[in-house]
Amino acid sequence: MVGDRVVRLTADNPSPMTLEGTNSYLVFGREGALVIDPGPDDEPHLGGLIALAQTRGVPIRGIAVTHGHPDHAPGAAPLRARTGAPVYAHAGARFPHDVTLEDGDTIDRDDVQLRAFEAPGHADDHLVFWLQDDGALFTGDVVVGRGTVVIAPPRGDMRAYLATLHRLRDDFSAARAIYGGHGEPVTAPRDKLDEYIAHRLERERQLLAALATGERTIPELVTIVYCDVSRVLWPAAARQLLAYLIALEREHKVHARTLERELSPDERAILNPDLSAMVDPQSAAVAAAELGYDDPVDRIEVYGRR
């Protein structure tokens, strides 16, 4: 529980990508509750959400989903089947939903008004939800309680993500708490957003500095820019570097050329790792979606400064 009106229930799906698990939230009104991010299709978790609503003597009247990744959205359909509550999602959502939300739309159920705002970057179908009366900002995987999030092509976009962070910092200065998709609530929202922005810009500075000394491939760049993180995380780091490089190439700050050779085993391990050998099947599905492995890297490119 995080407050009288907002209650958190964390799914039992811990992993390197989900921290302790996916956070689902119930926002209570006098006559009903809204669920934000039902999480995975997990019977104990969905049953727990229903039980929490029953303890307040109210039904679940709506299900709002921040984005379509498999640790956030699959529980929506079975929860709808059990409660009859409509599912609200982004216009670009690739999962079944009843109501499409545009930027600034309001979910108005009884005395709960939840505004939706587009928040691309981590995913192209991402929304955040604003409970203005409580100063509560529900950020899904845009901002989490601990660490940072993965921005990976093809559905992740680094420039869109930075724009989203700036928007959240500048337009939601009244926020008293951020409730992320993973980890604990953030009680100093502006400080956290400043930290996130500074972190992304520093990684970009490190990337450009590494390229200033000559052309390099992404696996080579990983060992330089992310030398401070565990090798286990290098595949995720590689995808984030790809997001930076796509943006920088679009802005004519770097150039790329394809090397006419196959990926080496070490390069393949970083660019297209075998997730099934690293984590359990459920965690592998989440990681594949987060890291964009439905779009594998099948060629090696070398990048340089313009």
Which role fits each region the language model picked out?
Residues 84-91, 138-140, 196, 231-233:
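Short hydrophobic/aromatic-enriched beta-strand-loop microsegments
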Residues 32-35, 40-43, 113-206:
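Metallo-beta-lactamase
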Residues 209-306:
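C-terminal regulatory/interaction regions
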Residues 1-56, 128-140, 145:
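Conserved beta-strand hairpin/beta-sheet module of binuclear metal-dependent hydrolase folds
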Residues 5, 49, 182, 207, ...:
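Residue-level signal for inorganic ion chemistry
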Residues 20, 33, 40-115, 135:
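Active-site HxH/HxHxD metal-binding segment of metal-dependent hydrolases
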Residues 74, 156, 236:
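Residue-level signal for the nucleotide or nucleotide-sugar donor/cofactor binding architecture
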Residues 66-72, 122, 182, 244:
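Histidine-centered divalent metal-coordination motifs
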